[in-house]
């Protein structure tokens, strides 16, 4: 039984029901339906902190999914898991793959910026001022792209850009 059919909370159950209805109404192939089921199960596992299970589901969804736009969200979520696990280099790989397929994904730009900013902070702690400036400048560029795509979001990033004179 797919994980999505075992959900106990109201929101997950509602989402599952609506998604199932849409999958019946909208013409989709069996492969697309399977890919979506794995994606949905991955999101459910991820929300519960079951990252290994989520990754298994996302990898299976990637194997089945052929649409670049849909694949971008799977890749983005894989990046989120690696970020949560502190695997920033791996997370960046997945965020960049997501952006290759969908350059209108502001949350991926934001997360890349957050990792760059974090690395800038680490460089400061190591007394490496030149590296910190480079990381912060990279963070600024990615935040600018995220803000351009979603102007009402990322207020803290907008403030940081203003305070640091990068906007």
Curated annotation (Swiss-Prot):
Organism whose genome encodes this protein: Chara vulgaris
NCBIfam families from the UniProt entry: PRK02603.1
Record flagged with keyword Transferase: no
GO CC terms of this entry: chloroplast thylakoid membrane
Database matches in Pfam families: TPR_1
Protein's GO biological process: photosynthesis
Each TPR repeat, start to end: 35-68, 72-105, 120-153
Keyword Thylakoid: yes
Name of the protein in its database record: Photosystem I assembly protein Ycf3
UniProt-listed PANTHER family: CELLULOSE SYNTHASE OPERON PROTEIN C, TPR REPEAT-CONTAINING PROTEIN MJ0263
Subcellular localization, as worded in the UniProt entry: Plastid, Chloroplast thylakoid membrane
Segments traversing the membrane: none
Purpose: Essential for the assembly of the photosystem I (PSI) complex. May act as a chaperone-like factor to guide the assembly of the PSI subunits.
UniProt family annotation: Belongs to the Ycf3 family.
Alphabetically ordered keywords of this record: Chloroplast, Membrane, Photosynthesis, Plastid, Repeat, Thylakoid, TPR repeat
InterPro entries named among the record's database cross-references: PSI_Ycf3_assembly (IPR022818), TPR-like_helical_dom_sf (IPR011990), TPR_rpt (IPR019734), Ycf3/AcsC/BcsC/TPR_MFPF (IPR051685)
Membrane topology: Peripheral membrane protein
């Amino acid at each position: 039984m797919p994980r999505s059919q075992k959900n106990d909370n109201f929101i997950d159950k509602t989402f599952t029901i609506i998604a199932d209805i849409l999958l019946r109404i909208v013409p989709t192939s069996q492969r697309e339906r399977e890919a979506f089921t794995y994606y949905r199960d991955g999101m459910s596992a991820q929300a519960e902190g079951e990252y290994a299970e989520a990754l298994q589901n996302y990898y299976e969804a990637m194997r089945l999914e052929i649409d670049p736009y849909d694949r971008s969200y799977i890749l983005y979520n894989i990046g989120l898991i690696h970020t949560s696990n502190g695997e920033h280099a791996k997370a960046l790989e997945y965020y960049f793959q997501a952006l290759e397929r969908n350059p209108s994904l502001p949350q991926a730009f934001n997360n890349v910026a957050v990792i760059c900013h974090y690395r800038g902070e680490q460089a400061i702690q190591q007394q490496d001022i030149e590296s910190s400036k480079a990381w912060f400048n990279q963070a600024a560029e990615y935040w600018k792209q995220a803000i351009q795509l979603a102007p009402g979001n990322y207020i803290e990033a907008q403030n940081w850009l203003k305070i640091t004179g990068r906007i």
